[in-house]
A protein has these predicted regions:
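N-terminal Lys/Arg-rich, disordered targeting/topogenic segments
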Residues: 1-27
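Functionally critical loop-and-helix segments that line ligand-binding/catalytic clefts
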Residues: 9-15, 113-184, 334-381
C-alpha cells in the first residue's frame, strides 16, 4: 500500500496517472456511445431505403394493373384474375337487389305505358288489357276484374288484320282479299217504321227482330214488341234472312218457359232461317229483377231456354257481352250453343267462340230513321 504525504494527499505522479486513466475511460465511453448512434442511424437509413424501394415496387405494380384494367388488357403479364367470394346471405342479397331493380324498371315501364295510353284518350280498361295477356280485364259495378282466360272453352280464330273498316264505320271480315262476312242489323220498336226495301239495297243480308221482353220490375210482365209482325214480314219480303230474339228477365223455370213458348208461338207463321236468340243482359243501375241471380241460376235458365227452342226444331243462340260472358254465365255449360257477342271496340279482344258480332249500337242504315245496332256474321249462315 502506497503511503500518503503528510497532508494526506496522493503523491503527484500517482494523481496524474489516475487522471489520465479517468480521461481515457471517459473518451472510451464517448466513443462507444457515438458508435452506437452511428449504427442506429445507419440501420434507420437502410430501412428507409428498403421501405421506399418496396413501396415503389408495390405502387408501380398497382399502377400497371390499373392501367391494364382501364385499357381492357387481358394478358397475364399485366393483370391477374380477381376472385371474389360471397356468403350465401350476400348472394341472396344481390339477387334480391337485382330482382327489385328489374321490378322497378318494369313497373316504371308499365306506368309509362299507362300514362301514355290515358293521355292519348284510351280508357283505363283498354290501357290495362295489353299488360295482362292471360286474363280478361272486365269492368263490372265500377270495379276492375281480372278473369283468367279459360283453356276449356272454344276459341275464335278471327284475325285482327282481316278486319276491314269502311269510311262510314261499317265492318267487314276479309280472307284472301274477299269479304267473307255478312252485314246485319237487329231491330225493335225503337227503330220505328222501317223501309225494308231500302235496308236490303244498303247491303243488309240478315236481321234479328225482337219478339218481346219481360219487364225488369218486380212484376216482370211479358210485353210483345208491337212492331214484330210488320218487321218480320217486311224483312222477308225484301229477301233478308231473319232471326228473332227475346229480352229475358226470367228468374224461375216457369217464367223462362213462358218466354220460350211465347217466342215459339210468335214465329210459327214465318220462315225463320236464322237462330232464335236468348238475350241475357244485366240491367244497368241495379234495377233488373234478374240481376241478383247467381251464375248457376242464370246459366241453368239460359240452357233451359236453348234446349226448349232446340226441341221445337229451331236453332238456339245466346246473346251476351263481356261482363255476362266472364262473370255472370258459366259458358262451359253452354258450349253446344252458338253465341252472339256484343262488343263496341275493333280490337277483337274477346277470345271465345262466337258467330255474330254486334260491333256498334249507333249505326246508320238506309230505310231506318233511328240509330240501329250493326252486326256481322262470320262465315256462312
Amino acid at each position: 500500500m502506497k503511503k500518503q504525504n503528510e497532508n494526506g494527499r496522493i503523491p503527484e505522479d500517482r494523481l496524474s496517472r489516475a487522471n489520465k486513466r479517468k480521461k481515457i475511460n471517459t473518451i472510451a465511453s464517448i466513443l462507444v456511445m457515438t458508435g452506437c448512434l452511428l449504427v442506429l442511424v445507419l440501420v434507420t437509413y437502410v430501412a428507409g431505403i428498403l421501405y421506399s424501394w418496396i413501396d415503389s415496387k408495390f405502387q408501380n405494380n398497382a399502377n400497371d394493373l390499373a392501367a391494364a384494367a382501364e385499357a381492357g388488357s387481358q394478358t397475364e403479364e399485366s393483370t391477374q384474375e380477381v376472385v371474389k367470394t360471397y356468403t350465401q346471405e350476400e348472394v341472396d342479397a344481390l339477387i334480391a337487389e337485382a330482382k327489385q331493380q328489374a321490378e322497378d324498371e318494369e313497373e316504371n315501364k308499365i306506368l309509362s305505358g299507362i300514362r301514355d295510353g290515358l293521355t292519348s284518350g284510351t280508357t283505363m280498361v283498354e290501357t290495362l288489357r295489353p299488360y295482362y295477356p292471360n286474363e280478361l280485364v272486365v269492368v263490372s259495378n265500377g270495379t276492375f276484374n281480372f278473369v283468367p282466360i279459360r283453356d276449356d272453352l272454344q276459341k275464335n280464330d278471327y284475325v285482327l288484320e282481316n278486319l276491314n273498316i269502311l269510311e262510314d264505320g261499317e265492318v267487314q271480315y276479309m280472307q284472301d282479299g274477299q269479304v267473307v262476312s255478312h252485314k246485319g242489323i237487329d231491330v225493335s220498336k225503337h227503330q220505328g217504321n222501317i223501309d225494308w226495301t231500302k235496308v236490303a239495297a244498303d247491303g243488309v243480308e240478315f236481321a234479328f227482330i225482337r219478339v218481346g221482353l219481360r219487364g225488369y220490375g218486380t212484376e216482370g210482365k211479358l210485353v210483345e214488341d208491337e212492331y214484330f209482325e210488320q218487321n218480320v214480314k217486311g224483312a222477308l219480303q225484301a229477301g233478308i234472312k231473319v232471326g228473332v230474339y227475346f229480352y229475358s228477365q226470367a228468374i224461375t223455370d216457369e217464367e223462362l218457359l213462358e218466354e220460350a213458348n211465347l217466342v215459339l208461338e210468335k214465329v210459327k207463321p214465318y220462315n225463320i232461317e236464322l237462330p232464335i236468340v236468348f238475350d241475357v243482359e244485366k240491367v244497368s243501375g241495379g234495377k233488373g229483377r234478374a240481376n241478383e241471380l247467381s251464375v248457376e241460376e242464370r246459366t241453368r235458365l239460359t240452357a233451359l231456354f236453348c234446349q226448349t227452342i232446340q226441341d221445337a226444331g229451331y236453332k238456339p243462340m245466346i246473346y251476351h257481352n263481356m261482363e255476362m260472358g266472364t262473370l255472370m254465365l258459366d259458358l262451359g255449360q253452354l258450349e253446344q250453343y252458338d253465341k252472339w257477342f256484343a262488343y263496341y271496340n275493333d280490337d277483337l279482344y274477346y277470345p271465345y267462340a262466337y258467330k255474330v258480332w254486334q260491333y256498334s249500337e249507333k249505326g246508320a242504315v238506309d230505310g231506318i230513321n233511328e240509330e240501329v245496332d250493326l252486326n256481322i256474321w262470320f262465315g256462312d249462315f
